Amino acid sequence: MSDPQEKSHIILKVWCFILGLALLITGAFYVIGGGKLISLGGSWYFLIAGLMITTSAFFMFKKKATGVWLYALAFIGTVIWALIDAGFEFWPLHSRLMFPAGLFAAVMLTLPSIRKYQYQTPMSAPAYVIGGLTVLGMLGGLYGMFIPHETVKASGEELPLVPVDPAKKQVNWDHYGNDAGGSRFVALDQINRNNVSKLKEAWRFRTGDFTTGTGNGAEDQMTPLQVGNKVFLCTPHNNIFAIDADSGKQLWKAEVNSTADAWERCRGVAYFDSTQPLVQPTLAGATPVAALAANTECPRRVYTNTVDGRLIAVNADTGARCKDFGVNGTVNLHEGLGENTKAPRFEVTSAPTIAGTTIVVGSRIADNVAADMPGGVIRAYDVITGKLRWAFDPRNPDPNYVLKPGEIYKRSSTNSWAAMSYDPQMNTVFLPMGSSSVDVWGGNRTAADHKYNTSVLALDATTGKEKWVYNTVHNDLWDFDLPMQPSLVDFPMKDGTTKPAVVIGTKSGQFYVLDRVTGKPLTKVIEQPIKVADIPGEQYSKTQPRSVEMPQIGNQTLKESDMWGATPFDQLMCRINFKSMRYDGLYTAPGTDVSLSFPGSLGGMNWGSIAFDPTHRYMFVNDMRLGLWIQLIKQTPEDIKIQANGGEKVNTGMGAVPMKGTPYKVNKNRFMSALGIPCQKPPFGTMTAIDMKTRQVAWQVPLGTIQDTGPMGIKMGLKAPIGMPTIGGPMATQGGLVFFAATQDYYLRAFNSSNGKELWKARLPVGSQGTPMSYMSPKTGKQYVVVSAGGARQSPDHGDYVIAYALEK
């Protein structure tokens, strides 16, 4: 044998050993995992393919072409199975075929050398053609990773740009959701879909208050306000800034420096101008807005409620405390709550709500800590004096009962932690309600809990009297508390008229459209029968509401074929995990076994809320698609001794956390693969446009890439728009645009509101969890888009940025 031939044989032996080893490992993993999957009632594919691949490995070690043919047969079967299992969806096919295709290309390109080694006809041409075509197909698959794959394609019809009515042109963004009804719609069109590509950074401001990025600590989730030439900001520790609307230069700073052991965030501030005339309601029978006391010290005010339980008013002109508000500018929100109220058990994270001359405040009560927790009482204060005007105590037989000295509000009652809305024509405040303590066990719940938990509540803003309440989950055991600001819209009815409505999205991926006056649904809602679990004494509801006439977003009933992974290996493990859990669809009740909740307690939709374009009756909403596995475990005497404070990372794999005062501790975690990737198929987060005239999805696109994240938190650097979990909210404009920033990658994006096409994006220094806002400067007439960037959720990169963009001159 000549030296070159001997050398080639050595190379072939080494290569066949490496290739055979790869086949053996793959086949063995398939056989072991596939056997387990079959035992759980799952697919036979992995076991059958594994046996074929393992056998092909032994022939490959022997450098025999039989190994190639066996693997080729396995690959053909894989392609057929993948098409049957996943259809023609890109990401599911990518997961099933990319790795096997790589092995197939390798064995086919090895075939001529093996046949030559066995002194057979090499078959070079067909082997190289098939191998080359497979490589080309893989390159096509790689190219497809960088193309957005819409889950719902737009019709192609371009919505016309409607000129701004001068009477409706936006002057200020002076509420958390732009207006009191939370539209997040900007009636400005200087920046529009035709020129947004020319948007450039105009200024950059730094607060000096950094986030931690853990998800459980300090997070920047702010939406700024703008009034006149001032932009008002707050930081995770509730420090307030006023900056110049054109230059971004600091005008004043109000030091607050609130602290908590966990969950430090300020989603926004509130603004009130006492020099403006009061707007009285026009609805017949509505209670008048209360008159104000004389006010000269602070004619214009900015309010923040803090994570350590204070409501603070500062002068909007100077930043100085308004001494006539409460005690030297501060109201103590711990008053009347009883013991154990220290944050993070009791906190206020969402912006306070200005409702006429009343400022309304809810609270965040820590989840799954104890049956005895601070009450979720809703309180309203005079905007000038800070005196308590009314309280709504959901567990009290008289919710508006006025406490006597030494009394406290009912413990563990239903709270409202998200932003509220206000209708000045009705003088009514609309509240998204949470759950009574604890969230995943309801054995101690009262009739009042069942009434108010996970409901939309309408209260008279002057008196606090209940107008109506609408329940969206019965005996909520899933932590499906209503997470977002109710949106007040004029809803198009099928007869061509419109009705004042409240629209709210839920963690369960549903939308409820309610008559604003009566609270009755304006779209069809059914009661869906559900299965119960095995918890003794649990007050199971046998049915749950389903809003069937509105789109369902990311809450489909999962099947084994919906399981996904970056490779077939983690996909197989996700299949095993899925089949190992009890799962009955959307309302799978927690039990003593391991069950799956999809979507989980993050949603679905969360606090980012909805943007509504009244010119076209389009609604825009982002979502995340994360499952949650959960198990209730009987507590031991040792568990009872543990004192939880509400700062535990119960969703990040720290183990079972005792729920004091209940029979159980709870163990739960996100339904993810070993690589830290959600187990169900992408997208994991989308932007959806809903045409409210037809009540259908107009378009839906994935949000975010894996450029700044990836498996096990490793930054992949790939601009592959797979669609990642989102937080924060959208902003729509009359310029035909939807802006969004709260993705896992570090971008502010602008989409065409007609079809979801990305028209522009700007790289941010770190990620954002904030909602963009926009205004037109009264000095320069220039429109700005502003967003905060303190770091994406659980990102290693933290910041303190507020950045404005405007068109180039």
UniProtKB/Swiss-Prot annotation:
It comes from Acinetobacter baylyi (strain ATCC 33305 / BD413 / ADP1). Induction: By protocatechuate. SMART domains: PQQ. Belongs to the bacterial PQQ dehydrogenase family. GO terms for cellular component: outer membrane-bounded periplasmic space; plasma membrane. The keyword Transferase does not apply. It is found in: Cell membrane. One of its GO terms (molecular function) is quinoprotein glucose dehydrogenase activity. PANTHER family: QUINOPROTEIN ALCOHOL DEHYDROGENASE (CYTOCHROME C), QUINOPROTEIN GLUCOSE DEHYDROGENASE. InterPro entries: PQQ_b-propeller_rpt (IPR018391), PQQ_mDH (IPR017511), PQQ_rpt_dom (IPR002372), Quinoprotein_ADH-like_sf (IPR011047), Quinoprotein_DH_CS (IPR001479). Pathway: Aromatic compound metabolism; 3,4-dihydroxybenzoate biosynthesis; 3-dehydroquinate from D-quinate (PQQ route): step 1/1. It is a multi-pass membrane protein. Can act either on quinate or on shikimate. Its cofactor is pyrroloquinoline quinone. GO terms for biological process: 3,4-dihydroxybenzoate biosynthetic process; quinate metabolic process. Its main location: membrane. Signal peptide: none annotated. Keywords: Cell membrane, Membrane, Oxidoreductase, PQQ, Quinate metabolism, Transmembrane, Transmembrane helix. This is Quinate/shikimate dehydrogenase (quinone). It catalyses: L-quinate + a quinone = 3-dehydroquinate + a quinol; shikimate + a quinone = 3-dehydroshikimate + a quinol. It is an enzyme of class 1 (oxidoreductase). The chain crosses the membrane at residues 14-34, 41-61, 68-88, 90-110, 127-147.
